[in-house]
From Swiss-Prot:
Residues 20-39 bind DNA. It comes from Shigella flexneri. Its main location: cytoplasm. Represses ulaG and the ulaABCDEF operon. GO terms for molecular function: DNA binding; DNA-binding transcription factor activity. This is HTH-type transcriptional regulator UlaR.
Length: 251
């Protein structure tokens, strides 16, 4: 983990907790007490936190920003950031987007926060962030809370047509020439009901997922309008997807 990543996580801890001890930083980041104190000193010198005895406090004048605590530990984080930035450029002012769960989903929502677009989501970490940042238009899909995924799931057979959007952004555990695969069946089935009422389906997966097949087939390749992935994605799979009408964007 780089120094910049440590600093970001430390600031995220302060945003949630308001105060952290050196011991808590050591435990969370897996670093030595000396390194933890150095990080606190540097952030204190730059005015990003208030150094106190045996720890640090959040700067009260700054509005705390909520974000998943493990966001920077997500696999292929930098690539996912590029994917999210590219995806956010597709949406025009006044349009509505459906964003589902996961680290890439959160990164995309963060990119779109503050823009004149309506964000529809069942991912509570993202919804909390958008509300905290006072995003103008947020729709939270109702249903039963699923703790393992931090999402709400509506009962089987219920209508989700009220949540139609111009765009639907989703990801999964694997993408082949057959289509997109997801491992959580409840989540996948809830999202599948929306495929017929969204304008365009855009799949966001990092390059390590291309060619992988895991879980259930969520959507066939011919249902996918666009794929945004990394530059190291398997070119053979990408060619097969393009042949089926999928637009490919590598970042």
């Amino acid at each position: 983990m780089t120094e910049a990543q440590r600093h970001q996580i430390l600031l995220e801890m302060l945003a949630q907790l308001g105060f952290v001890t050196v011991e808590k930083v050591v435990e969370r980041l897996g670093i030595s007490p000396a390194t933890a104190r150095r990080d606190i000193n540097k952030l204190g010198e730059s005015g990003k936190l208030k150094k106190v005895r045996n720890g640090a406090e959040a700067i009260t004048q700054q509005r705390p920003r909520w974000t998943p605590m493990n966001l920077h530990q997500a696999q292929n984080h930098d690539e996912k950031v590029r994917i999210a930035k590219a995806a956010s450029q597709l949406v025009n002012p006044g349009e509505s987007v459906v964003i589902n769960c996961g680290s890439t989903a959160f990164l995309l929502g963060r990119e779109m926060c503050g823009k004149p677009v309506q964000i529809i989501t069942n991912y509570l970490p993202l919804a909390n962030y958008l509300i905290d940042q006072e995003h103008d238009s947020v729709i939270i899909m109702g249903g039963q809370y699923n703790k393992s995924q931090s999402i709400t799931l509506s009962p089987q057979g219920s209508e989700n047509s009220l949540y139609a959007g111009h765009w639907m952004f989703t990801s999964g555990k694997g993408l082949t020439a057959e289509g997109l695969y997801k491992t959580d069946m409840l989540t996948a089935m809830a999202e599948q009901k929306m495929l017929s009422v969204v304008g365009k389906l855009v799949v966001l997966v990092d390059s390590s997922k291309i060619g992988e097949r895991a879980g259930m087939l969520f959507s066939r390749a011919d249902q996918i309008d666009m794929l945004i992935t990394g530059k190291n994605a398997n070119p053979e799979i990408l060619q097969q997807l393009e042949a089926q009408g999928v637009s490919i964007l590598r970042v």
